[in-house]
UniProtKB/Swiss-Prot annotation:
It holds the Pfam family NTP_transf_3. One of its GO terms (molecular function) is molybdenum cofactor guanylyltransferase activity. SUPFAM superfamilies: Nucleotide-diphospho-sugar transferases. This is Probable molybdenum cofactor guanylyltransferase. GO terms for biological process: Mo-molybdopterin cofactor biosynthetic process. The N-terminal domain determines nucleotide recognition and specific binding, while the C-terminal domain determines the specific binding to the target protein. The gene is mobA. It catalyses: Mo-molybdopterin + GTP + H(+) = Mo-molybdopterin guanine dinucleotide + diphosphate. It is found in: Cytoplasm. It is an enzyme of class 2 (transferase).
């Protein structure tokens, strides 16, 4: 099972690349890697990013998005890594701007997936908040690759397009025993300031 850290966004709203922003002296991407490593669930953790940022990561497993799908958002990162690892049975996806994700959240979602896998033949297990799904904290089966490819070749790179074609189920973020901010993504500097005040 591989983990994909999505870190290819332009971070326009934040003002600088979010992967290298810091919480308590630790970069977002380092925090996410450390959390994923602590679960002992993954045989490889891969950072998905763009050519401009790739050399700035102090980490060996960095993959640049497929050049045919530049600037097509997070689906391009998932697509690129799934294509490179056709033998893999499952992928966990998390965005780099979710620095407070916990190992407990990852393992809880995995247990949810496994418990529903046989009965529901799930392709995707994701979290949801107030009825809205969070596609960038989710497990994806390789079966999702076809729907992702189709979306990337259309003019709509929305996860909604992908999810409509797949067997998907959701776990509420409140079902995780963790601080209430564990799943929050940081879009603006004031989001980070507010998070730091809570820590």
């Amino acid at each position: 099972m591989k983990a994909i850290i999505l870190a290819g966004g332009h971070s326009v709203r934040f003002g600088k690349p979010k992967a290298f922003a810091e919480v308590n002296g630790e970069t977002f991407y380092s925090r996410v890697i450390k959390t994923l490593e602590s679960t002992n669930m993954f045989n490889e953790i891969i950072i998905s990013t763009n050519a401009q940022l790739a050399t700035q990561f102090k980490y060996p497993n960095v993959v640049i998005d497929d050049e045919n799908h530049n600037d097509k958002g997070p689906l391009a990162g998932i697509y690129t890594i799934m294509k490179q690892h056709p033998e893999e049975e499952l992928f966990f996806v998390v965005s780099v701007d979710t620095p407070m994700i916990t190992g407990k959240a990852v393992s809880t979602l995995y247990q949810f997936l496994v418990s529903h896998l046989i009965e529901n033949h799930l392709d995707v297990a994701a979290f949801k908040e107030d009825g809205r799904f969070i596609p960038t904290i989710a497990f994806y089966s390789p079966n999702a690759l076809g729907a992702i490819t189709k979306a990337l070749h259309s003019d709509n790179y929305s996860f909604k397009n992908v999810y409509h074609e797949l067997s998907t189920d959701y776990l509420d973020v409140r079902d995780v025993d963790a601080p209430s901010y564990w799943y929050k993504n940081i879009n603006y500097q004031h989001d980070l300031d507010a998070l730091i005040q809570k820590l």
